[in-house]
């Protein structure tokens, strides 16, 4: 059974899918509605209000919401859909933590190396603001709460929605596209949208969603996506901050670069060059084959003897 077929191990009534999606994804839905119907001045006022909060308190408030939501998603899967969390995580007999670690180290290594090269070549738009006590608290908050934040996003978009939409439409490409677009829309209230532009940031968010979705389908599990997402977000919190980003933190550096000029380096380069290279690295390491079938193949219900619904 492939990753999407894991949904057959549980109850799949449509009302269960709708109820779980609405209840768990409510925070993302409200974010999008707020962005859609708010005046630009209201958005700016909301961002300015949050900037006045202590940075670590702001981070705790933003990330703390994901803790109960991830737990609630697990409860709905376990007791409403009556299937295991393992089936939501991977098609393997057990979670492969080495895969999580590898993708985590891959994105961290790339980010730190490229940042170091850029800093060595031109540091004029970066302010070194390291404060040991503030950074120690930031590090503690980040390593505790970011796993819940990225966990909810991965288990919801690449996990729950990918599996259940795939079972509904009987293919793989449609849930890959839909969950990637929804992943982008879920971030539409981020302040980066106002600083850089809606469509520019959608290229990045949807492109990142596609990367994580391709990882999940090709590898039959969330492990690589979980590691990548965690490494990316941790470094976004700890390494560099800026006045216009969603994460206002006591990071090691602060960027003063004009965000409107970041189309090439921050959006097109990662999506069109870096992401494909990372997929090739993972494909080589894990022996991915049959790309067409894994990304565009049909979904069929397995024989009953291949699985059982948890009572």
Residue ranges and their predicted role:
Residues 65-76, 104-115, 177-181:
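Hydrophobic alpha-helical transmembrane segments of multi-pass integral membrane proteins
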């Amino acid at each position: 059974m492939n990753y999407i077929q894991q949904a057959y191990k549980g109850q799949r009534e449509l009302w269960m899918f709708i109820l779980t999606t609405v209840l768990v994804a409510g925070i993302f839905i409200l974010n999008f509605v707020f962005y859609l119907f708010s005046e630009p001045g209201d958005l700016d006022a909301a961002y300015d209000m949050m900037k006045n909060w202590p940075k670590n308190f702001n981070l705790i408030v933003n990330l703390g919401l994901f803790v109960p939501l991830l737990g609630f998603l697990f409860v709905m899967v376990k007791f409403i859909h009556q299937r295991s969390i393992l089936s939501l995580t991977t098609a393997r007999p057990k979670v492969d933590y080495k895969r999580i670690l590898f993708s985590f180290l891959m994105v961290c290594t790339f980010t730190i190396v490229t940042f170091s090269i850029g800093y060595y070549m031109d540091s004029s738009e970066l302010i070194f603001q390291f404060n040991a006590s503030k950074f120690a608290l930031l590090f503690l908050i980040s390593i505790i709460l970011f796993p819940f934040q990225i966990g909810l996003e991965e288990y919801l978009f690449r996990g729950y929605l990918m599996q259940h939409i795939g079972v509904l439409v009987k293919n793989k490409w449609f849930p890959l596209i839909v969950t990637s677009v929804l992943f982008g829309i879920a971030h539409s209230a981020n302040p980066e949208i106002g600083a850089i532009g809606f469509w520019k940031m959608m290229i990045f968010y949807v492109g990142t969603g596609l990367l994580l979705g391709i990882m999940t389908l090709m590898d039959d599990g969330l492990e690589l996506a979980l590691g990548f997402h965690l490494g990316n977000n941790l470094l976004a919190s700890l390494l560099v901050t800026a006045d216009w980003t969603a994460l206002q933190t006591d990071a090691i550096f602060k960027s003063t670069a004009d965000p409107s000029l970041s189309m090439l380096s921050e959006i097109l380069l990662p999506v069109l060059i870096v992401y494909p290279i990372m997929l090739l690295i993972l494909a080589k390491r894990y022996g991915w084959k049959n790309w067409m079938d894994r990304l565009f193949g049909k979904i069929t219900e397995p024989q009953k003897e291949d699985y059982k619904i948890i009572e």
